[in-house]
Amino acid sequence: MAAVGSPGSLESAPRIMRLVAECSRSRARAGELRLPHGTVATPVFMPVGTQATMKGITAEQLDSLGCRICLGNTYHLGLRPGPELIQKAHGLHGFMNWPHNLLTDSGGFQMVSLISLSEVTEEGVRFRSPYDGEETLLSPERSVEIQNALGSDIIMQLDDVVSSTVTGPRVEEAMHRSVRWLDRCIAAHKRQDKQNLFAIIQGGLNADLRTTCLKEMTKRDVPGFAIGGLSGGESKEQFWKMVALSTSMLPKDKPRYLMGVGYATDLVVCVALGCDMFDCVYPTRTARFGSALVPTGNLQLKKQQYAKDFSPINPECPCATCQTHSRAFLHTLLHSDNTAALHHLTVHNIAYQLQLLSAARSSILEQRFPDFVRNFMRTMYGDHSLCPAWAIEALASVGITLT
């Protein structure tokens, strides 16, 4: 079945993105998202929560770190506790006691992560609940209905998600279906004045398919666009080229959300390529393995070398963990049954991600972004010859050289 050629019935979408500054050399941009629960400065990293909470950090702590937007998962929230209960709590904001913005995903990612539990048809995605085994259909209409009930500030279309390493007819089928499902999501969206529906660009690693998807989806006047179908095992060279292709064709006056990207180098490179929003479980997941994010990479605090190290994780980090605890203390906690270390590391790792993109934003505003990139790479890798070849190539494609 071919992609639907006529845009959906969405009324003129609100312009939620205000561009504040652009890098004179690369595609990097600094902006503001004007959302129902406040303004969000971009570029921005968005921490990920599954069931109305972040693992290892409270909403109050996220607030204190300066986080102004985070994610919730429609698939999990739709199953447990369910949208009806959350609606009674005045939406997800009230349920979480979160005063700032929320973005909910569509539930489509579980088509990849829970593939053994799902079946995809034109109707939607049929899941078997991992909680009770009950079968449920997540259609584009139901995904939007759940997200309308949750009351998030940004909602995502249901897309047909395939792993980035899949090739062949399934990728084309998924791309065309994602366009058709976008129109169904637009038609089902009942709260256009309060919630901003983003389209998700698909097409895998095939430039022609991704170009077709970009041309089709940008005909729809939605408030923003996500770049989907990446960060799933493809090579970094394939990854950056698809990101660059996407940002080259997306409208400049709308936000660009690169899904599932969280490694520091990836964030900096993709800001240079023109992306505004990022999310990933990486900072919280890596904390649970005793790993702390620092400008030079990661500290594996379980290692014996930190047993008598009384310095903070990062002396320049203002987070509560670095202001209060030493590496030696965290090392000791990690070797006990105490879960406090995971909490302290999560606070620090999220702070690191937020600070990194805040620093990138400041450099864009001050027209020194290329220098920011060079300093970041020098600190992370030492000599520029040790930087990943893909990153050097990607940065060069937008006019930033490291020498």
UniProtKB/Swiss-Prot annotation:
Signal peptide feature range: none
pH-dependence annotation: Optimum pH is 7.3.
Binding site for queuine: D105, S106, G107, G108, F109, D159, Q202, G229
GO cellular component labels: cytoplasm; cytoplasmic side of mitochondrial outer membrane; mitochondrion; nucleus; protein-containing complex; transferase complex; tRNA-guanine transglycosylase complex
Annotated stretches, region: RNA binding: 260-266, 284-288
Localization, UniProt: Cytoplasm; Mitochondrion outer membrane
Predominant subcellular localization, coarse grouping: cytoplasm
Cofactor: Zn(2+)
Catalytic-site annotation from UniProt: D105, D279
Pfam family name, one: TGT
PANTHER family per the UniProt record, alphabetical: QUEUINE TRNA-RIBOSYLTRANSFERASE CATALYTIC SUBUNIT 1
Subunit-level organization: Heterodimer of a catalytic subunit QTRT1 and an accessory subunit QTRT2.
UniProt xrefs under NCBIfam families: Q_tRNA_tgt, tgt_general
Protein name: Queuine tRNA-ribosyltransferase catalytic subunit 1
Organism: Rattus norvegicus
